[in-house]
Amino acid sequence: MSWTTPKRAFIGAATAEGGTKLNAFDNALLKLGIGNVNLVKLSSVIPAHIEWMEKVHDVPIGMLLPTVYAHIESDEPGMTISAALGVGISKNNEGGLIYEYSGYCTKEEAEEMVRKMVEEGFRQRGWELGEFKVASAEITVKDKPAAAIAVVVMFPY
């Protein structure tokens, strides 16, 4: 297998319920258009000059997709769960960083956490932050297991 530097990326977030926690996770992936592919977990560096997509489309079933993701599942009624990804893009789009967080919290709390992580990551590298993107999802568990997921999916084309 050969890997190439990604050229495009999609950022998104979703929640879902399911018969089990894993089914809830799968249902959230389906909402994002990535439920029929194989996610390959990445660490958190964005290549230079990446183009951002509005949505995922025409992805072959079973494709290996490099993905940074945060997720949480729960079957505890009344619990609020959230997942967030913060994306920092450097000035002149020379690269960037993605940080992920999930927990028993509101999406605003998760968003604040990833913003702090992005800012620290840039500070540690001596990079100047040009743009910040965030994707987050929140759900309160009712009578079925629930999941929240936030993703950045990278595409070689």
From Swiss-Prot:
Coiled coil: none annotated. It is an enzyme of class 4 (lyase). Gene3D superfamilies: 3.30.60.30, Pyruvoyl-Dependent Histidine Decarboxylase, subunit B. The keyword S-adenosyl-L-methionine does not apply. Binds 1 pyruvoyl group covalently per subunit. GO terms for molecular function: arginine decarboxylase activity. One of its GO terms (biological process) is arginine catabolic process. NCBIfam families: pyruvoyl-dependent arginine decarboxylase (TIGR00286). This is Pyruvoyl-dependent arginine decarboxylase. It comes from Thermococcus kodakarensis (strain ATCC BAA-918 / JCM 12380 / KOD1). The gene is pdaD.
